[in-house]
């Protein structure tokens, strides 16, 4: 099991790996570019090579990229949709160059056109972008179901995957806070939640997870992360979650609202909670 947090690569991949090491991490997540928009930073091959060497030296697991929030693959507006496709396609190429195997993508928001229309739009966009030899697996993130978000139910993620021409390059990233907000009771019975995921989507598609507590109650459809043990999921439930055998070998990253010192403390707590 690889434990980490969301870090910045603004100073390069090598710097981010060293920061990860300083907090006891063996993986990390990062944005492919400014999360609110803007041009992508040019990649430095030497920096990438040094970061790969460091990761191998310290037994890192796979890194996880995260697409910017500005892309909406479900957008009904052509200009917005075209921007999302262009950005995602470019970032897949960039992450393949950086040898980052996973990229998390929010499915998108249907903006009032309805879930089915949103799913159709997402699958159409992905079918235009995805290639069997792209070298990066796109991970659809399970959402909390806020507003017009697509992906708040496992069935919605399954419908997207079912519409793909190359489904083998698509997986899923779950988030403990999003699951709780969407109405999946990770506090009382995470095993039952994963059983439902396996039945509807298949555990073989679960490639990464975000570990967050929640400020909002079960089924609130609100995405408000909390520090581990300081939210409504709680330490006991999160410890049980971390010890589920389906998570062994996966990169698990924090997205909690803290500073680097909080990440260091939370990673130490997660490691101490592991029984295997």
Curated annotation (Swiss-Prot):
Its EC number is 3.1.21.2. Binds 3 Zn(2+) ions. Keywords: DNA damage, DNA repair, Endonuclease, Hydrolase, Metal-binding, Nuclease, Zinc. Zn(2+) 2 binds at residues 141, 175, 210, 255. GO terms for molecular function: deoxyribonuclease IV (phage-T4-induced) activity; DNA binding; DNA-(apurinic or apyrimidinic site) endonuclease activity; phosphoric diester hydrolase activity; zinc ion binding. InterPro entries: AP_endonuc_2 (IPR001719), AP_endonuc_F2_Zn_BS (IPR018246), Xyl_isomerase-like_sf (IPR036237), Xyl_isomerase-like_TIM-brl (IPR013022). It is an enzyme of class 3 (hydrolase). Zn(2+) 3 binds at residues 178, 223, 225. Zn(2+) 1 binds at residues 66, 106, 141. PROSITE patterns: AP_NUCLEASE_F2_3 (PS00731), AP_NUCLEASE_F2_4 (PS51432). It comes from the Bacteria. Its cofactor is Zn(2+). GO terms for biological process: base-excision repair. It catalyses: Endonucleolytic cleavage to 5'-phosphooligonucleotide end-products. Belongs to the AP endonuclease 2 family. Endonuclease IV plays a role in DNA repair. It cleaves phosphodiester bonds at apurinic or apyrimidinic (AP) sites, generating a 3'-hydroxyl group and a 5'-terminal sugar phosphate. This is Probable endonuclease 4. The gene is nfo.
């Amino acid at each position: 099991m690889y434990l980490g947090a969301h870090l910045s690569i603004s100073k390069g991949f090598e710097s981010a790996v060293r920061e990860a090491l300083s907090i006891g991490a063996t993986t990390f997540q990062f944005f492919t570019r400014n999360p609110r928009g803007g041009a992508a930073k040019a990649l430095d091959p030497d920096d990438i090579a040094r970061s790969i060497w460091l990761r191998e030296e310290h037994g890192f697991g796979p890194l996880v990229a995260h697409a910017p929030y500005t892309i909406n693959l479900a957008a009904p507006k052509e200009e917005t949709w075209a921007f999302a496709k262009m950005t995602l396609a470019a970032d897949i190429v960039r992450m393949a160059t950086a040898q980052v195997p996973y990229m998390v993508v929010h499915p998108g928001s249907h903006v009032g056109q309805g879930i089915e229309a949103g799913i159709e739009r997402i699958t159409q966009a992905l079918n235009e972008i995805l290639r069997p030899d792209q070298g990066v697996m796109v991970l659809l993130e399970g959402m909390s179901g806020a507003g017009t978000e697509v992906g708040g139910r496992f069935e919605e993620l399954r419908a997207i995957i079912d519409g793909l021409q190359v489904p083998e390059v698509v997986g899923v990233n779950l988030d403990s806070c999003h699951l709780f907000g969407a109405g999946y009771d990770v506090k009382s019975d995470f095993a039952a939640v994963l059983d439902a995921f396996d039945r509807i989507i298949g555990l073989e598609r679960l490639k990464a997870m975000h570990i967050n507590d929640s400020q909002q109650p079960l089924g609130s459809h609100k995405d408000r992360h909390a520090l581990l043990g300081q939210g409504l999921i709680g330490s006991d439930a999160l410890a049980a979650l971390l010890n589920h055998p389906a998570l062994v070998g996966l990169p698990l990253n924090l997205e909690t609202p803290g500073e680097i010192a909080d990440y260091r403390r939370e990673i130490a707590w997660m490691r101490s909670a592991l029984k295997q």
